[in-house]
């Protein structure tokens, strides 16, 4: 945070908005991810979300972030990670009977702990390697998780039939 703010010469308001952007984007993009989950099934929608985040971090790492606006754009793409929660819940809960869905969703929700761990670890990594290299380092666990996800995650055998956009708008 501090290194980014210094390098980009951000005001306090810009720092606050930069930090809030992924959270706000994630909240808004959950609707879009929910549509993808219902139309493509949870596994495919979750994979698309993960690939979007990985590509965004790779581009930020290789090309760098040189302005406040670029930081906000990256924040929008990182918001997709938060939106992916809309894929995790049905992916987990549809496998279990109602009496076990709370536990399944609680375990799936623990996946959000990666954001907290990143917030704890990233500042130390930024000091040691430079803040733009943190984007590259973040790719290591993200790609590993994507590989495991693709190998191990399965859509439940009984998923609701996909709906058209017109059917959603009729609600």
What are the residue ranges of the model-derived segments?
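Flexible cytoplasmic inter-helical loops of multi-pass small-molecule transporters
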Residues: 151-171
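Helix-loop-helix hairpin linking two adjacent transmembrane segments in secondary transporters
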Residues: 107-157
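Cytoplasmic helix-loop-helix junction between adjacent transmembrane helices
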Residues: 74-111
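Extracellular/periplasmic helix-loop-helix junction of adjacent transmembrane segments
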Residues: 1-27, 68-69
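A generic transmembrane-helix signature of 12-TM secondary carrier transporters
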Residues: 50, 54-58, 74-75, 139-146
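Residue-level signature of mid-helix packing/kink "hotspots" within the transmembrane helices
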Residues: 23-31, 83, 115-117
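Conserved MFS/SLC helix-loop-helix module at the cytosolic interface between two early adjacent transmembrane helices
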Residues: 28-68
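Interfacial helix-cap and linker-helix signal at transmembrane-aqueous boundaries
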Residues: 4-5, 36-37, 124-129
């Amino acid at each position: 945070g501090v290194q980014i703010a210094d390098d980009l010469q951000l005001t306090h308001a810009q720092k606050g908005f930069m930090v809030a952007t992924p959270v706000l984007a994630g909240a808004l993009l959950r609707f879009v991810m929910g549509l993808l989950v219902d139309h493509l099934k949870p596994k495919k929608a979750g994979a698309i979300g993960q690939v979007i985040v990985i590509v965004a971090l790779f581009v930020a790492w290789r090309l760098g972030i040189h302005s406040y606006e670029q930081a906000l754009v990256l924040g929008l793409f990182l918001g997709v990670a938060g939106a992916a929660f809309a894929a995790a819940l049905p992916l987990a809960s549809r496998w279990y009977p109602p009496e076990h869905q709370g536990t399944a969703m609680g375990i799936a929700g623990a996946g959000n702990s990666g954001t907290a761990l990143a917030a704890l670890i990233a500042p130390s990594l930024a000091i040691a390697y430079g803040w733009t290299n943190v984007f590259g380092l973040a790719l290591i666990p993200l790609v590993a998780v994507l590989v495991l996800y693709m190998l191990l995650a399965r859509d439940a055998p009984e998923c609701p039939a996909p709906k058209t956009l017109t059917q959603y708008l009729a609600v």
